[in-house]
Amino acid sequence: DDAFMIYDIYNGFAVKTYQDIIVGYSLQDFIVAEGKICGAVISKPLNVQNIRVILKNTGFKSIFHENVRLTCSKSFMVSTNEQQTRYNAGDVFELTPDNELLLQGRVTVTPDNGGEISILSVMRSQGVPSYEGSIELAAADDGIVIVNDVPVESYLKRVVPSEMPASFAVEALKVQAVCARSYAYKHLENGAYSEYGAHVDDSTMYQVYNNTSEQSSSNEAIQNTRGQILTYNGEVVQTYYYSTSCGATTDVGIWGSDSSSYPYFVSRFVSRSQKELDLTDEAAFEAFITSKDENDYDAGYALYRWELQADITALSNSFNAKLYEKYLSAPSKILTQQADGSFQSQKITDIGTITSVTVNERA
């Protein structure tokens, strides 16, 4: 129904929209009238158990697969709304977009007795990846979408070593585990992939999942922090993290977001030495970024300082394409200078060839 509304009576009382429905969890009772779903009432708490992950193709290039080939370490069941077929361990099941099974809805692959499903048509750094939980296959206009429905703690076993070397110190692995768990909890409420019945994908767009197989050291860190998440005023925080620091962190203003909405993200120096620098000052920032301080924790890593050389034509073409893309997504934020010096939002696809890049102001 066009007037569909959700009433949350568990957390006091709040009016929400269909975008607030959490995929894979039955937290609401739906209201049906005259053959239409016209509303819902949330009356239950979210008890986090599983997360639903879209598995991208080889190279993490797309969520759509031209075909899917899989097998299992134990016997497994392939089912749709209309039929079920049992396969033996080691049997190969293959699906193409024109397979009539997909006309029956989602195809679900469920292993017996804790078996793991190997996706033979996908390659990762570790080789052929295998997955706990179940695998769902759904038809889409551009191919087949693969969704792995897996317990959160099992998901973390293949996230932590994919995001941080398992050879790192145990306390570092524990921190990574807590951050990864918090990130997963937060994105259960993310509706970006709701049309595909998923919460996240397995690439750097979210958290890298199962690029590296699980390791005993990271598994221990996950077990020792089981259930631990980061919160602020009772809410799970958005735990962004990255691999290498330049010697200073930043707040969400780097993405144009309002830093006051995320008070737990604070810009700090990441160093053994005490520094008093104003990095919003261009001269101070230039001196900072063009020098190296051995006291900075990441000073020994290649990406601590880096340079880029780019062909000016290729750079201009890339910028023009991105500029138009940004204009389409947020036209009010892309302003073009007019003849009288004022700035207005208008369609712009090409500013020509870039001649120079300057910084007018640092946040």
Language-model regions, residue ranges each:
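Conserved, single-site charged/polar hotspot
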Residues: 1-363
